[in-house]
Each structure stands twice: as structure tokens, then as C-alpha cells.
Design a protein with these regions (language model features):
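Bacterial Sec-dependent N-terminal signal peptides
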Residues: 1-21
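Non-globular targeting/processing and membrane-anchoring segments
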Residues: 20, 35, 118, 129, ...
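Thiol-based oxidoreductase modules, predominantly thioredoxin-like and allied folds used
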Residues: 21-24, 63-105
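A short beta-strand-turn-helix
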Residues: 23-40, 70
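Short active-site neighborhood of thiol/selenol oxidoreductases, capturing the structured segment around
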Residues: 37-51, 76
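Solvent-exposed coil/turn segments that connect beta secondary-structure elements
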Residues: 48, 81-82, 131, 143
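Detector for the c-type heme attachment site
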Residues: 54-58
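A short, hydrophobic beta-strand/beta-hairpin element that forms part of a small beta-sheet core
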Residues: 76, 97, 113-116, 121-138
Length: 185
């Protein structure tokens, strides 16, 4: 019995040590933080019904390397693309006038901010620069190493030199991921 308790304690300690959380904030909080310490913003646009969004949360955003890198170099925003939050951003108010509370956990109307960025699929990760200017949408599920490419691309401003699809393809082919893929299942 003692061995089982020790083994269980060790397993739980290992899970706790390996667990890392991204410090999620609202878009408005990120804008306020920008004024004190400018960083790029990584905004996860998700929905409650989206399976790949849940997988992104579980497998990628819970990854220790991803969480550490994001927390160090970005403000991370979680935004429900079909939610009913009212957002003040870029001297505008964004809401979801078509929101139906009865459909809160299923497909709902798109939020105005979602439409503002032209997001039509979930998950989509939107990157904004330190001046809150739109950099790019990254659509679909990405594992930690796939997301690493974009995190480092925008952090290092390498995207500014990639003016053609061929240049991006070369960057993609030569990129050497460093993040470890771990299972959180």
C-alpha cells in the first residue's frame, strides 16, 4: 500500500511539474498592458462547440514550451468568436447583436470582432504587433512545433522579410523546431 501511495504521489508531482499555464488576458487587458510593456499579441479565437479548439487547448496551449514562450514574449488573449462580450478596441465597440443565449454552447452568430478580422473558421490564432496592427491569422489546429514556427516568426519579425510564398516555403522547410511534443491525454 505504501508503494502505491508513493507511486501515486510521484505521478501527480510529475504532472504538476510539467503542467504550465498560459497567462490568458482579455483583449482590453492586453491593450492596457501594451502601454506599460509593449509586446505582440497572440489571440486565440475559439468557440465552445469547436473540437479542434479544445484539442488546441489540451495539446498545444498546455505544452510547457509553448506556455513558457508565449508568457515571455506575447500577451495571450482568449476570445470566443461567437460569444456575447462587448469589446472596446481601436476606438470602436464590438459586440454580437445576433447572439442567441439559447445557443451558447452550439453554433451562434459571429461576433463583430471576428468579422472585423475576417475569421471564418475556428480555431484561428490572430497575431497583432506591438502597435495593435494585424499581422496574420493562423487557421486550424497546430501542434506545439507547428505553432512554434509562427510564434518565433512574428516574435523575431522574420515575417517582414518573407514577401513571397516561395520565401515562406523556404523558411518553413529550414525551420528547426525546439519545442517538445508531450502528451496531455
Amino acid at each position: 500500500m505504501k508503494k502505491i501511495v508513493i507511486l501515486l504521489t510521484f505521478c501527480l508531482a510529475t504532472v504538476y511539474i510539467n503542467a504550465q499555464e498560459i497567462n490568458w488576458v482579455t483583449l482590453e487587458e492586453a491593450v492596457a498592458l501594451q502601454k506599460k510593456n509593449p509586446k505582440k499579441i497572440m489571440m486565440d479565437v475559439y468557440t465552445k462547440w469547436c473540437g479542434p479548439c479544445k484539442r488546441l487547448d489540451r495539446d498545444t496551449f498546455q505544452n510547457k514550451d509553448v506556455a513558457n514562450y508565449v508568457n515571455q514574449h506575447y500577451y495571450a488573449v482568449k476570445f470566443n468568436g461567437e460569444g456575447n462580450d462587448e469589446i472596446s478596441f481601436k476606438e470602436r465597440k464590438f459586440s454580437n447583436p445576433g447572439y442567441n443565449p439559447a445557443k451558447a454552447n452550439s453554433r451562434n452568430s459571429a461576433h463583430e470582432l471576428t468579422r472585423f478580422y475576417g475569421i471564418r473558421s475556428y480555431p484561428t490564432i490572430v497575431f497583432l504587433d506591438e502597435n495593435l496592427e494585424f499581422l496574420a491569422p493562423i487557421r486550424g489546429y497546430k501542434n506545439p512545433q507547428q505553432l512554434e514556427l509562427y510564434l518565433k516568426l512574428f516574435k523575431k519579425n522574420d515575417h517582414k522579410q518573407l514577401t513571397t510564398q516561395e520565401a515562406f516555403n523556404d523558411y518553413y522547410e529550414t525551420f528547426k523546431p525546439e519545442f517538445k511534443i508531450t502528451s496531455n491525454k
